[in-house]
C-alpha cells in the first residue's frame, strides 16, 4: 500500500488531500454521511434516499416488502416524509456547521430543524449546509440558522449544490 501511495504521489498531477477536501466535495454533491445526515433512526425518504429502494420492493412491486423495517419505510415512501434532508445556502461567508438550529423566523419560535452537515463549498464559492427540515418548506424559502447568538438567513436549496459528474 505504501509503494502504491508513493507511486501515485510521484506524479506531479497528484496531490494528497485530507478529510476536509473529501467532506467539501461530499457536501457540494449533496451526499449524506452516516452518523451525521442519516443514521438508524432516519428512514430513506427523510434522508433523500428514496431512490435506493427498488420499485420491485415497494408497495405493489413483484417482491414488495420483506426487508427489515419495510412497513415504516414503505409507508413513508408512499405517503411522504414529514421532514427531509435539504440543502441550505447561508448568506454571507460564515459556514454553518453540524448541530446549528434552524428557525422559520428571525426572532422567537422553536427550532424547526438542525444542520446535519455544513462547511465551505469551494466549487460554489461559499458556505453550504444540509439540514432535516419540514418537507413542506419550498425551495427558495428563507430560514434562519442560529450562529454565535445571531440568526443568519439561509436559503433552502435543492440538492446537489453542483451538477454531479457521477451516476447513481
Identify the meaning behind each predicted range.
Residues 1-168:
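Conserved, structured C-terminal
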Amino acid at each position: 500500500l505504501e509503494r502504491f501511495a508513493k507511486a501515485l504521489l510521484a506524479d506531479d498531477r497528484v496531490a494528497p488531500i485530507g478529510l476536509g477536501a473529501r467532506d467539501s466535495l461530499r457536501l457540494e454533491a449533496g451526499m449524506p454521511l452516516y452518523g451525521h445526515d442519516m443514521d438508524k433512526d432516519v428512514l430513506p425518504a427523510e434522508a433523500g434516499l428514496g431512490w435506493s429502494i427498488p420499485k420491485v420492493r415497494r408497495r405493489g412491486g413483484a417482491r414488495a416488502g420483506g426487508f427489515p423495517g419495510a412497513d415504516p419505510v414503505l409507508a413513508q415512501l408512499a405517503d411522504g416524509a414529514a421532514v427531509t434532508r435539504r440543502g441550505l445556502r447561508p448568506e454571507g461567508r460564515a459556514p454553518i456547521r453540524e448541530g446549528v438550529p434552524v428557525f422559520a423566523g428571525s426572532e422567537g419560535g422553536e427550532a424547526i430543524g438542525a444542520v446535519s452537515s455544513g462547511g465551505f463549498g469551494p466549487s460554489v464559492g461559499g458556505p453550504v449546509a444540509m439540514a432535516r427540515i419540514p418537507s413542506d418548506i419550498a425551495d427558495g424559502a428563507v430560514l434562519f440558522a442560529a450562529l454565535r447568538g445571531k440568526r443568519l438567513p439561509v436559503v433552502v436549496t435543492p440538492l446537489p449544490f453542483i451538477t454531479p459528474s457521477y451516476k447513481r
